[in-house]
Amino acid sequence: MAENVLEAVSVNKYFYDPVKFRVLTNLSFSIEKGTFVSVVGKSGCGKSTLLYILSTMDTDYEGEIILDREYLHEKNSDELAAIRNAKIGFVFQFHYLIEEFNVLRNVMLPGIKLGKLSKQELEARAYEQLKMLGVSDQALKRPNQLSGGQKQRVSIARALINEPLIIMGDEPTGNLDKKNSDIVFGIFQDLCAEKKQTLLIVTHDLDFAKRSDRVIEMRDGQIMT
């Protein structure tokens, strides 16, 4: 029987300004370990709102989120930050690399925050991730010296540095051309197939979504598939 990495149970979300409005309606689903899941739907359907709840960055919701068999809703902000750093890797539309640091240091940052490895161990792991993603030759460069596709590969390496249970992405190919979008998709596919990495990716790219293992379609705050 497959192990569930992430579960949402009867999740509801409201916005209150200017009037009370339900954004997410009674969402329940689970994601099995080692699956590549895409979330699709029109703008405003609640995709990114759901992702922020699942990633523990939004705690103002009804229902329950279970990550690695831990119930998250009653945990405080410090506990959630620790869980987020240890168990979730993030890849966004924008890379959010720090220009003052070189590529290697950027990849190491979540590991430095976690504090489980020595600097030498962390450097070695960061370099291995960059090598796997084909950008190890850029390790000592600053982000502004990289192409858009290279920056996104570096951000994926950063997401992997703490060996997370799940990688969550919000439009990770949104700023990329077709060639680089395909490269990023291939990286995700390989991570899932070879390393049993669990992926949950919000995307507008239906071609990207169709090639993943599973598609969750959202409409007006509800799950259709």
Question: What residue spans do the PLM features occupy?
Answer:
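ABC family nucleotide-binding domain
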Residues: 4-6, 11-211, 215
